[in-house]
Structure formats: structure tokens, C-alpha cells
From Swiss-Prot:
GO CC entries: cytoplasm
Name recorded for this polypeptide: tRNA-cytidine(32) 2-sulfurtransferase
Keyword Acyltransferase: no
Highest classification ranks of the organism: Bacteria, Pseudomonadati, Pseudomonadota, Alphaproteobacteria, Hyphomicrobiales
KW Nucleotide-binding (keyword) present: yes
GO terms, biological process: tRNA thio-modification
Amino acid sequence: MNAFDPDIAEDAGSDGCHPLFRDVPTTVEFNKLRKRLLRLTRQAIEDFSMVKPGERWMVCLSGGKDSYGLLALLLDLKWRGLLPVELLAVNLDQGQPNFPKHILPDFLNRYEIEHRIEYQDTYSIVTDKLPETSTYCSLCSRLRRGNLYRIAREEGCSAIVLGHHREDILETFFMNLFHGGRLAAMPPKLLNDEGDLMVFRPLAYAAEDDLEKFATAMQFPIIPCDLCGSQEGLQRNAMKAMLTDIEKRMPGRKDTMIRAMTNVRPSHLLDRKLFDFAGLMLNGEGEGDHAV
């Protein structure tokens, strides 16, 4: 059996649970939700070969529902013996006005979760370089990424783990399709340019609605994402609205879209760098690919 085996029963470790879950009402509905999220997280970890036993992962914690959910699910898997890595929760306080500095340390200390809180006033840098009417998210995220890479190296972590979910990936795909003229989304596993750190997204298969329900049931102390007064651009909001409308009209399409990303056929696209169209030759055997 592998150190990380997706066939291990869902109820492994049912004689106990991580302290995070001890005060949560164990309703049938919540148990189903928790098992579904655990299953999807484990599936993504296995599908994209994220685990190397003994490594140290840096789990980025912003105070939003997704990062709280990510941390809780990884701790749950580790508690059950299904995730043989060390976990370090890291929050980067970027100096946003009115940021409640006590919430995350109080939460992490309460449950004895290993963590690091890092203060770097990138907010002042962003507001100094951009006009007030600008959307700060792009520059802010670049500055955040640089600091997270530095912290991961200082802490001896081999991977930075982010809480992007199914909808984040789909929205990015359609933003690139409609506005960038390319087929690309958020990769579930990425090697940084320097080649010394991996970036993982174990929630790639998880639905945002499920993570929201999970956060509510777990009573996470959510920190608002709009403290800086800047909201993410209209393009992503438009993609989110479009996907919501599609899912409402045709339930299950989001899952179908995610499956499509795992089933790419370069011979049925137009990218000559991915498929050798010039090399196609008549061979008289009738065994070529078939258009559908």
C-alpha cells in the first residue's frame, strides 16, 4: 500500500478527530459534506502526485472561507493518517486598513496549529504606485507571491498550498479564453521559475458552494476580503455570473467542464505546437483519429 492510498476507508481514524472538529455538530448532512470534500481533496492530491512523505507544506491562510477549509481538510487527512507531510499555516498580513490582527493567531493558538504570522506592509506600496481608482489585486498578488516564496524557503517548506477551488479554475479558464485568446487555467500543481518550490491546489475539484457550507458549519471566524476597498476586476465577476447561469440552466455543467480539462485532445484543436498536423499521412489502414 502506498503512503498515500485513495482506497483507504473514509472512516479511518473515526475513533477520534482533529480538535478543529470536536465542537462541530455531527449532523448527517454535515458528515456527508465533510466526506465529499475529503474525498475530492484526496482525489486531487493523488491525481496530481502531490505527496512525498516527510515533506513540509506551507498552507496559506488568508482568513477567507476557502483557506480555512483547505487547512481544516488537510489537518483532517493528516489526523487520519492519509497525509504523511508536515503542515505549517502561514498568514501574510499585508497592512490592509482595519485588518483584525487578533483573529488568526487566536484561532490557530486555540487549536494548537503550527503557524507563522508575517507582517509586510505591501498595501502602502500598492497604494503609492497605483491611482485610487485602480484595482489593486494584480500588483498586490505579485507582492504577496514574492513574500510567500521567501517565507516558504525560510521555513524549509517544499510546497506552497493554496485554497483555489473548482470555480476559481473555471473562471480563470474562461477569462483566458475570452480575453487572452488562449486555453489555460490554474494548474493544480506548478513548479516555480527557480525550480525549488511547488505550488499545490488540492481543492481543484471542490465546489465553492460546498466550501461555503463547510465554513458556516465549522463556524470559522471569516475575515472580509474587501478590507482594502478594492474589488477584483469586472472580468472575473462576469465569468462567475456566466458560470452560475449555466449551472442553473444545466445542472452539473461545472463538473463536466472540469472533467473536460482532464480529457484534452490536441489533434482536435488548432495548436500546431501541440500536434504535428504536417506529419499526418495517408496510410490506407483507416486507423486514424475520428472527429466527433
